[in-house]
From Swiss-Prot:
It comes from the Eukaryota. Disulfide bonds: none annotated. This is Serine/threonine-protein phosphatase PP2A catalytic subunit. InterPro entries: Calcineurin-like_PHP_ApaH, Metallo-depent_PP-like, PPA2-like, Ser/Thr-sp_prot-phosphatase.
């Protein structure tokens, strides 16, 4: 492991939106894998902690998030996935978050989103960005191999269940989730896929997801899951919401989305959720950071919103 000084210098470099050299990126992913392999499918997290939703390569908005919420390690953070794709700076964004994880392993929790996947990143931007910035796909491979080790969910003080997408008809209990083999590419279907792809819905019961993966689940499903597992709340990301956060399903579920003006055109606010020492909840909303000069991108990503 490198010294803290080495990591601090890398983080300082990354905070200026400068990618690491390829070899350092590989070393960083190796270091992170050694940490993540020891973490759980349901990773326990203590409060206080600040919970964050999708980032999607919007690097300068991530810096704004830290300005609003506090820098690590002064603030503990839990990120619920989707660090890459869509935005212009997936490389710098995911590298910074992984570097912070390696430097402050007990203060930063990074979960897997549906975009932390080989297949999705080949379509929605991260793969092409790696080719553009490094001239080859090696860095893409280092990170997508690392993504297989990211925890699927987290549990704050045994009360607030955090994950990227939503529930699964195959998973009634947290112990069911703990029993999954997560170290693999995100499957096209099944319980692991559902955790990263499902959405809450106004209709009761389970429904077919319009996304083509995962399910929709009703208030009755969320309430039963929370009751069965002694939970007070499901916190998830995965869906853009105009105010940055949205309560639903009789406050059994909250969606947090942390990419303001998503895709640089949606005009939405972003939010993060502070969980205090006594489990008190406080939302901090923020607008986009000032626009930077947009990098030249030769290949446009598809418009379909995943």
């Amino acid at each position: 492991m490198p010294s803290h000084g080495d990591l601090d210098r890398q983080i300082e470099h990354l905070m200026e939106c400068k990618p690491l050299p390829e070899a350092r990126g590989q070393t960083l992913c190796d270091q992170a894998r050694a940490i993540l392999v020891e973490e759980w499918n349901v990773q326990p997290v203590k409060c206080p902690v600040t919970v964050c939703g999708d980032i999607h390569g919007q690097f300068y908005d991530l810096i704004e998030l830290f300005r609003i919420g506090g820098n690590a390690p002064d603030t503990n953070y839990l990120f619920m996935g989707d660090y890459v794709d869509r935005g212009y700076y997936s490389v710098e964004t995911v590298t910074l978050l992984v570097a912070l994880k390696v430097r402050y392993r007990d203060r930063i929790t990074i979960l897997r989103g549906n975009h932390e996947s080989r297949q999705i990143t080949q379509v929605y931007g991260f793969y092409d960005e790696c080719l553009r910035k490094y001239g080859n796909a090696n860095v893409w491979k280092y990170f997508t191999d690392l993504f297989d080790y990211l925890p699927l969910t987290a549990l704050i003080e045994s009360q607030i269940f955090c994950l990227h997408g939503g529930l699964s008809p195959s998973l009634d209990t947290l112990d069911n989730i703990r029993a999954l083999d997560r170290i693999q590419e995100v499957p096209h279907e099944g319980p692991m896929c559902d955790l990263l792809w499902s959405d809450p819905d106004d209709r009761c019961g389970w429904g077919i997801s319009p996304r083509g993966a995962g399910y929709t689940f009703g208030q009755d499903i969320a309430a039963q899951f929370n009751h069965t597992n002694g939970l007070t709340l499901i916190s998830r990301a995965h869906q853009l919401v105009m105010e940055g956060y949205n309560w639903c399903q009789e406050k059994n579920v909250v969606t947090v989305f942390s990419a303001p003006n998503y895709c640089y055109r949606c005009g939405i606010m972003a939010a993060i959720l502070e969980i205090g020492e006594n489990m008190a909840q406080n939302f901090l909303q923020f607008d986009p950071a000032p626009r930077q000069i947009e990098p030249d991108t030769t290949r446009k990503t598809p418009d379909y919103f995943l």
